[in-house]
């Protein structure tokens, strides 16, 4: 475990890396005693600093939702990060590549909460009843720490959350079987990745349930209007300057952004 001073130093490192768009040395290397509790405390510290500076908390993201990713990270559960309003990107937007260190994109579904949801004891049905609608999303992920990261680094770095674009057609959570929502990620008109939403813990709503229970253990709830990225169901696609990324969700429409 780290001291409070070391946790604040870690937050300083992450914020400096984001400001300078230059990856820092892994926190797990600089602070070998770091524990997962430290990592969540660090990500919370960074989020609180940004909120104090004027940003607004609008939701959360869930990561590491596939068994393969959990095994590679040597954990047995997902992780989460905070979504702030300054991370939102319009569908069709031109995004400055220079604003990121090494941006990548993922295909996801976003749940917008209609009712307050707080764990423990939240299950799939609870999530579906509390959700106002579900909408396609592209998440931009951007690690502020160098490669060979450990789970402690990923969690402290807010799950690499960097940007979110919503688009396509919103649907009610009970209108379709969300497991069968498919996503195709194109880069410059070529298919790079495909996936099914069932890849998120068997059902994307289970990613939201896990989050509600995790936050409930911390004394926090998902509030009405909050956005939850339930977890990626594709592998990441690296984005270079000049690339156009288009996520096709079939009957639910699509989203596109361009890095300039």
Cite the ranges covered by each PLM segment.
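Catalytic-core "active-site belt" of small-molecule-metabolizing enzymes
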Residues: 2-203, 240, 244, 254-260
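Hydrophobic/basic alpha-helical segments enriched in Actinobacteria
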Residues: 192, 218, 249-250
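Active-site proximal loops enriched in glycine and acidic residues that flank catalytic Cys/His/Asp
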Residues: 231-232, 249, 259
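Short, charged beta-turn/beta-strand-edge "cap" motif at the junction between a beta-strand
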Residues: 233-237, 251-254
